[in-house]
Every structure is written in structure tokens, then in C-alpha cells.
């Protein structure tokens, strides 16, 4: 089963954007629920996005330095 990891709502503005700063996990790597997957930055803050479920990071859909908006799929976790 594949789980899409999406950029969550970052505040009151549904059109929020963030930049992928640094991937903390490589494709093919095992991850546990709650592990940090990627570091993100906005114009107001920096934060890490946690893994929603235990599995394997099968595919990164965005590169470091790319800007994404709320709801965009960042990666796929195979469970």
C-alpha cells in the first residue's frame, strides 16, 4: 500500500507555500511513524515534517530547493 505524504496546512492561509530545505531520508530507506522525513522552510519558520506511518520511503517527488504549496505530495511511503 502506498501513502502520499503531503504538505499540511501551515496556518490560517490555505495557500501557504514552503521550500524543501533538506531531505533527511533517502529513497529505499526504512522509516518509522514520527521519524522526520524532510526539513521545510517558510518565510516565517523552519520545521521538520514527520512520517505518518512506518514503511519505506519509495519515492521523493520534489527536490531540495523546490517550492511546494499546501496539499502537494512530497513523497511516497510504501507500507
Over which residues does each language-model region extend?
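Short hydrophobic beta/alpha edge segments that flank linear recognition/processing sites
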Residues: 32-50, 69-79
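Acidic, low-complexity mobile loops and tails
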Residues: 1-39, 48, 54, 60-61
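PDZ-domain C-terminal substructure recognizer with occasional recognition of PDZ-binding tails
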Residues: 55, 60-74
Amino acid at each position: 500500500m502506498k501513502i502520499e505524504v503531503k504538505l499540511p496546512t501551515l496556518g490560517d492561509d490555505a495557500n501557504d507555500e514552503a521550500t524543501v530545505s533538506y531531505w533527511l531520508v533517502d529513497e529505499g530507506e526504512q522509516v518509522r511513524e514520527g521519524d522526520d522525513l524532510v526539513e521545510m522552510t517558510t518565510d516565517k519558520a523552519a520545521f521538520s515534517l514527520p512520517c505518518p506511518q512506518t514503511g519505506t520511503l519509495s519515492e521523493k517527488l520534489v527536490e531540495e530547493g523546490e517550492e511546494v504549496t499546501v496539499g502537494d505530495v512530497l513523497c511516497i511511503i510504501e507500507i
